[in-house]
Amino acid sequence: MSEHKKPLVLMILDGWGYREDEQSNAILAANTPVLDELWATRPRTLISASGFDVGLPDGQMGNSEVGHVNLGAGRVVYQDFTRITKAINDGEFDSTPALVDNIDKAVSADKAVHIMGLLSPGGVHSHEDHIVASIELAAKRGAKEVYFHGFLDGRDTPPRSAKASIERIEAVFAKLQCGRLASLIGRYYAMDRDNRWNRVEKAYNLLTLAQGDFSYPTGVSALEAAYERDENDEFVAASTITPAGAEPVQINDGDTVIFANFRADRAREITRAFVEPNFDGFAKQKSPALSAFVMMTEYAADIDAPVAFGPTPLVNVLGEWFEKHGKTQLRISETEKYAHVTFFFSGGREDEFNGETRELIPSPQVATYDLQPEMNSEMLTDKLVAAIKSGKYDAIICNYPNGDMVGHSGVFAAAVKACEAVDHCIGRVVAALNKYGGEALITADHGNAEQMANLKTGQAHTAHTSEPVPFIYVGRDATASEGKALSDVAPTMLHLMGMEQPTEMTGKPIMTLK
């Protein structure tokens, strides 16, 4: 007869942050007797789920994708933005092979280096610090002609806020004396993602043919003229920047182009126009034979171009480590968070590991979840209790989506009901563990439901927060450590299961058995 396993259950309460202020706090307003008792009587602490602690920029709120990647990886997983910024700060950026080698190619052939990208401090698709670092690197490598082609933001930044960024770039060139700002166009044209090729064509022709609707001597004068035409940053018409006595800049044969955006979705189309031999989005008037077109990150696996910061495969994430040690695992959630407990928790892997089972509970078909704040949590719990009873699993990873999905609605009363529904379900799970054997860790991936209104404006607060999240151990006697983060959860699970930790996991157990 097969062994009856007593599982360690990781319950991830999505969007369940910790905030002591009762104002607009749906979690504190909710009647949660189960969690209240566990918090009062069990080993517990608070852990960080935002900012540097999860590989995001300092102060940036957490999110579900980043949270689950860190939970499953057992190490801080740096997001592309943070990786590149860190490389600049550490000096490693200046020796990145894809950048150095391809700048050098253009320099040795006496050709130009063109940097293009979203000129913005927004940090969503790009960051102007990365653009400045790229321009400075080209100058350090001896490029005599360095040109920047700016795409203006106004979506991830205020609609008319580009002036300071343009002034910064013009100051960089004034200092370096080896090139200039060459063109400006709104991201509406250069960064389409819906195959609106007529928009992309305008940007491509500006870059390769210096074909603009307007020409100005400076970037600031171009921007001011755009505002006169009532164009916000995002929609600025194609403008060449041509000082008196200078020629408009075109991207020509032998030049190197560096695309400084790090987010892929809106970088792909214009990249394909440059690099794909059989490109058919529009009829190109010019196809420069470049020394290289360098992508800052991998925009798509099928784009054949050098990548400065390639994907970093995560080795020995928790699921893989379980597989290597013959452990069985269940991943279970509703539709809304199913990808998070599978793909993201597995470090970006679609396939199941050996010994892994997946259980998908359909989320309710309602327009918004405030209409059914309990979602399908009872159905999810039925399956979870059955899995505990079955004795088949060494570990179970479960996500209750309610705090986040109802939190996003901004409806306070519904968020309170969502929290109460989850608390009731936790009671059922703990009762099943007491009856059939097993232990639980209860935590969250980021905050949300603990702040449902902006206290200054009174408007609904529908976003995530940067609050810490609870971490409770329902099991043996243990001591909790302070100052931990999501990346310490997988090492905690291994410690409680009596398993060694892979060297790739740099997190440390949050709970130590007494």
Curated annotation (Swiss-Prot):
Pathway: Carbohydrate degradation; glycolysis; pyruvate from D-glyceraldehyde 3-phosphate: step 3/5. The active site is at S64 (phosphoserine intermediate). It catalyses: (2R)-2-phosphoglycerate = (2R)-3-phosphoglycerate. Signal peptide: none annotated. It is an enzyme of class 5 (isomerase). The keyword Cytoplasm does not apply. It comes from the Bacteria. Monomer. Keywords: Glycolysis, Isomerase, Manganese, Metal-binding. GO terms for molecular function: manganese ion binding; phosphoglycerate mutase activity. Mn(2+) 2 binds at D14, S64, D445, H446. The keyword Isomerase applies. GO terms for biological process: glucose catabolic process; glycolytic process. Catalyzes the interconversion of 2-phosphoglycerate and 3-phosphoglycerate. Its cofactor is Mn(2+). The gene is gpmI. InterPro entries: Alkaline_phosphatase_core_sf, BPG-indep_PGM_N, Metalloenzyme, PGAM_B_sf, Pgm_bpd_ind. Transmembrane segments: none annotated. Mn(2+) 1 binds at D404, H408, H464. GO terms for cellular component: cytosol. This is 2,3-bisphosphoglycerate-independent phosphoglycerate mutase. Binds 2 manganese ions per subunit. Substrate binds at H125, R155, D156, R187, R193, R263, A264, D265, R266, K337. Belongs to the BPG-independent phosphoglycerate mutase family. The lineage of its organism: Bacteria, Pseudomonadati, Pseudomonadota, Gammaproteobacteria, Alteromonadales. It comes from Pseudoalteromonas translucida (strain TAC 125). Its EC number is 5.4.2.12.
